[in-house]
Amino acid sequence: MSRFWSPFVKDLVPYVPGEQPKLARLVKLNTNENPYGPSPKALEAMRGELNDNLRLYPDPNGDRLKQAVAEYYGVTPAQVFVGNGSDEVLAHIFHGLFQHDAPLLFPDISYSFYPVYCGLYGIAFEQVALDEQFQIRIEDYNKPNAGIIFPNPNAPTGCLMPLQAVEQLLLANRDSVVVVDEAYIDFGGETAISLVDRYDNLLVTQTLSKSRSLAGLRVGLAVGHPDLIEALERIKNSFNSYPLDRAAIVGAAVAFEDREYFEQACRKVIESREVLVGELQAKGFEVLPSAANFIFARHPKQDAGELAARLRKQGVIVRHFKQPRIAQFLRITIGTPEMNQALLDALS
């Protein structure tokens, strides 16, 4: 703490990201990165941007990427917002859409950045308990609110809320913005983007860090009614008019255009997930149903924190959350078959 800090900074409780180990020999199954590389076409497109044009500012609107997203999902570019990772997109959403008198609602088990944003922007919030199966009860959100946000599939549980239930939540909250955070939707769910033309209060966020293997590039997006998108553009242009560099815009656009590679990579992750679930269940683990590129598992005879520490000593990193209701679970990223086998060998 410095004497130069403002009182505001002193009271901030920042987000704690997953560990990024420096030792290459570790099997990294803790931050939900894709074990398969980006689209080769996207890599080639980015290499093409490494020229004298880097002396010029990038397109502040990211129109090439907006067009690619719009074509992929069957919406218009005016319904698309892009930013420097979905975390930045979410920050703009909190800043521009959730600062009202009533509290923001989100699940008690969800992305731990949500309360951080609330602290940063002075947003009152209420964490609504998931049911015993870690699912949202729609009736629990039938109360005055400044908005609703939830991850689908849930992070960190991986549990999926069906699209029909998402629509029921929208119908029950027509006067509030409902944000569906779809960081992991491509690994087993149905996107709510198909609903944006019917619900002007719906905003869907996604990232290219997971299913499109571009975590190191930092690209995120939101899709919704043009009025909601305009609010995000106003916040963006009051903060950073050039959030995406030239290579990121082109590489992300091509990642959307290369559907064949994207579908192949997702399919491999899903197949590996189902194999790993079976292997862990055979070892006595309870594994929650997952529609993500990770699983949430616990063992009735093992303390999760101690197990995570022992796995690390054997060169395998998984994520443990010291949080009520889930303190005995481990979140395990789906790796390549070889990475998953290393986990199983360590458990043995």
UniProtKB/Swiss-Prot annotation:
Protein encoded by which gene: hisC
Annotated metabolic or biological route of this protein: Amino-acid biosynthesis; L-histidine biosynthesis; L-histidine from 5-phospho-alpha-D-ribose 1-diphosphate: step 7/9
GO molecular-function terms, A-Z: histidinol-phosphate transaminase activity; pyridoxal phosphate binding
Catalyses which reaction(s): L-histidinol phosphate + 2-oxoglutarate = 3-(imidazol-4-yl)-2-oxopropyl phosphate + L-glutamate
Family annotation (NCBIfam families): hisC
UniProt key word Amino-acid biosynthesis: yes
Subunit composition and interactions: Homodimer.
Protein family according to the UniProt entry: Belongs to the class-II pyridoxal-phosphate-dependent aminotransferase family. Histidinol-phosphate aminotransferase subfamily.
UniProt cofactor(s): pyridoxal 5'-phosphate
HAMAP family: HisC_aminotrans_2 (MF_01023)
Domain of life (superkingdom): Bacteria
Organism from which the protein derives: Pseudomonas putida (strain GB-1)
Gene3D superfamilies given in the database record: Aspartate Aminotransferase, domain 1, Type I PLP-dependent aspartate aminotransferase-like (Major domain)
Keywords of this entry: Amino-acid biosynthesis, Aminotransferase, Histidine biosynthesis, Pyridoxal phosphate, Transferase
Residues with PTM N6-(pyridoxal phosphate)lysine: K210
EC number, as in UniProt: 2.6.1.9
Gene Ontology biological-process annotations: L-histidine biosynthetic process
Descriptive protein name: Histidinol-phosphate aminotransferase
